[in-house]
From Swiss-Prot:
GO terms for cellular component: extracellular region; secretory granule. This is Pro-thyrotropin-releasing hormone-B. The gene is trh-b. GO terms for biological process: eating behavior; histamine metabolic process; hormone-mediated signaling pathway; negative regulation of glutamate secretion; positive regulation of gamma-aminobutyric acid secretion; positive regulation of insulin secretion. One of its GO terms (molecular function) is thyrotropin-releasing hormone activity. Pfam families: TRH. InterPro entries: TRH. Its main location: secreted. It comes from Xenopus laevis (African clawed frog).
């Protein structure tokens, strides 16, 4: 709109200049009065257009808060502009409030929670066991006793505290002795009663001494 008024003013000025050059000298006294009237009219029109545009802009700015307030009132109190805020945020920063809450927690528990989330679903129970062992020894003992009850009576896992109290160099020897003793029992049970070999001649001579041989002979006599 402003551009059109400026074009009109420019065209009027150009036409006035051309017309003044073509008029004779006798009409020079009357021509300036007419030109001044035209310029005054154009000036009034331009000023009026400026004022109207300024008033329209003020009215728009005045109506904009009212429209925003109406939209704000129509929305749910807990969901106002929530979607727009989430869209404007970075995808990796939308959980900023959760991150602030996690910072208030204990540093050691924060690491355990992250580990549980990253672990396989079937291995999270192991993480709980380790956390219970670190925080509470009584909980660890209860869990260990529960595991030992589920196992076979002859194959229960030995107590780790008992193993730690032993000498490091003697743990393997005692385990080997127990294994050889059990293997010899199994071999004796699988053989024929009348064909069982002498303990001193077998692969595992665990009781090859005179006292044990006499005791075995007495037991066989009583059995006969």
């Amino acid at each position: 709109m402003m551009f059109l008024w400026w074009l009109l003013l420019l065209g009027t000025a150009i036409s006035h200049k051309v017309h003044s050059q073509e008029q004779p000298l006798l009409e020079e006294d009357t021509a300036p009065a007419d030109n001044l009237d035209v310029l005054e009219k154009a000036k009034g029109i331009l000023i009026r257009s400026f004022l109207e545009g300024f008033q329209e802009g003020q009215q728009i700015n005045r109506d904009l808060p009212d429209a925003m307030e109406m939209i704000y009132k129509r929305q749910h109190p807990g969901k106002r502009f929530q979607e727009e805020i989430e869209k404007r945020q970075h995808p990796g920063k939308r959980d900023l409030e959760d991150l602030q809450l996690s910072k208030r927690q204990h540093p050691g528990r924060r690491y355990l929670e992250d580990m549980e989330k990253r672990q396989h679903p079937g291995k999270r129970e192991e993480g709980d066991w380790s956390r219970g062992y670190l925080t509470d020894d009584s909980g660890y003992l209860d869990l260990f006793s529960d595991v030992s009850k589920r196992q076979h009576p002859g194959k229960r896992v030995p107590d780790p505290f008992f193993i730690k109290r032993q000498h490091p160099g003697k743990r393997g020897i005692e385990e080997e002795d127990d294994t050889e003793f059990e293997n010899s029992k199994e071999v004796g049970k699988r053989q024929h009663p009348g064909k069982r070999y002498d303990p001193c001649e077998g692969p595992n001579a665990y009781n090859c001494n005179s006292g044990n041989l006499q005791l075995d002979s007495v037991e066989e006599g009583w059995a006969a």
